[in-house]
Swiss-Prot record:
Glycosylation site positions: 73, 294, 308
InterPro entries to which the protein is assigned, alphabetical: ESAG
Signal is among the record's keywords: yes
Function: Not known but may be related to activation of the variant surface glycoprotein genes.
Signal peptide start and end residues: 1-23
Keyword set includes Transport: no
Keywords: Glycoprotein, Signal
Higher taxonomy: Eukaryota, Discoba, Euglenozoa, Kinetoplastea, Metakinetoplastina
Highest taxon of source: Eukaryota
Pfam families, per the entry: ESAG1
Name the UniProt record assigns to this protein: VSG expression site-associated protein 221A
Length: 329
């Protein structure tokens, strides 16, 4: 009998604990509830998300622009190299018959022609990789940029409204009453944002940073201390803004009980996972810089070889034959 009573007590205790464990139990929690972090840190946690989205947008935009620029420059270089290499091949086929007694010069011309062909092939290999990267970037990044901008706007709006609620609006009266308060100004955020509030700061905007969030989500809860006059307009704002934009990546609940008036869960993985994957396509800007440098270096070597080729080609005895090809060399 005693055993049954003990089991019943344990069961009731467990049910009570589960019932008391509010929304977001499996997420990183920021709430003025029990032992969890103070809600003033919500500004830091949420601003971390908006800053990360802003950084993701900037890096994605840079990747798109750099890829386009590098591809355009590489295309011009390769077209020039291929054009001159093709002309050189034409000259060789025309003048072979008149150089039977100039074996040494003919062999040098053939050697230079082969070198130019090899350099063009190497540049072409790099260009092919750039072309593949450009296709991926053009397919993924423009849409991801639009989505990132929408997400950033929504999260930044949430940051602004939460900032108001942690007391950064300066009121003329000690206790503001809805409809009668007079705003004197906006204060500075007093909360110092510790490193723990922003996994993206140390890990970059990457999947490893998303993994730092418990359950890959962030829960923000605010006690009834919240100013009710902010809740109604905020509810309309959220429903037509962030909730509509973020979809199932955001859970916003207005609980008018005595326990919690503000509950917000941001599913970090659903926001950042697809975006990080989209911006990860293609070749990184740092690698693109190396590739265009290599292509430019190949062009310089090509120019040297081509100069040697033309210096032999334009000897007195070969000028007529070269001119007969109607070449622009």
């Amino acid at each position: 009998m005693k055993v049954e009573i003990v089991e019943l007590v344990v069961l009731l205790f467990s049910v009570t604990c589960v019932d008391a464990w509010l929304q977001g139990a499996d997420c990183t929690r920021v709430a003025d509830h029990k032992e969890h972090a103070p809600v003033t840190e919500a500004v830091c946690y949420l601003r971390c998300l908006s800053d990360a989205l802003n950084k993701l947008y900037s890096e994605g935009e840079k990747k798109l622009l750099v890829t386009e620029e590098v591809y355009a420059n590489a295309s011009l270089i390769l077209d020039d190299m291929e054009g001159r290499a093709g002309e050189s091949s034409t000259y060789l086929s025309v003048i072979r018959g008149v150089m039977e007694e100039q074996t040494d010069r003919l062999e040098k011309l053939i050697s230079y022609g082969n070198k130019m062909g090899n350099l063009v092939a190497k540049a072409g290999g790099l260009f092919a990789a750039l072309e593949d990267s450009l296709k991926e970037v053009r397919k993924e990044i423009p849409g991801a940029l639009i989505k990132t901008n929408k997400y950033y706007t929504s999260v930044a709006e949430i940051v602004r409204t939460v900032w108001e609620d942690v007391g950064e609006i300066l009121w003329k009266e000690t206790e503001a009453k809805c409809g009668s308060q007079k705003v004197e100004g906006v204060g500075e955020i007093q909360t110092e944002c510790g490193a723990h509030t922003c996994p993206f700061a140390d890990n970059g905007v990457a999947a490893s940073a998303v993994d730092k969030y418990k359950g890959h989500c962030l829960y923000v809860g605010r006690n009834s201390y919240l100013r009710h006059c902010f809740n109604l307009p905020r509810g309309r704002l959220y429903r037509h803004g962030p909730v509509n934009t973020l979809g199932d990546a955001l859970e916003w609940e207005e609980n008018w009980s005595d326990y919690m008036n503000f509950e917000l869960t941001v599913k970090v993985q659903k926001i950042f996972g697809p975006l990080i994957a989209s911006f990860d396509v293609g070749i990184a800007p740092s690698t693109l810089a190396e590739m265009i440098n290599n292509i430019t270096s190949l062009q310089s070597r090509f120019n040297e070889v081509h100069s040697n080729f033309t210096s032999i080609l334009f000897t007195t005895k070969l000028k007529t034959e070269v001119y007969n090809t109607d070449s622009t060399i």
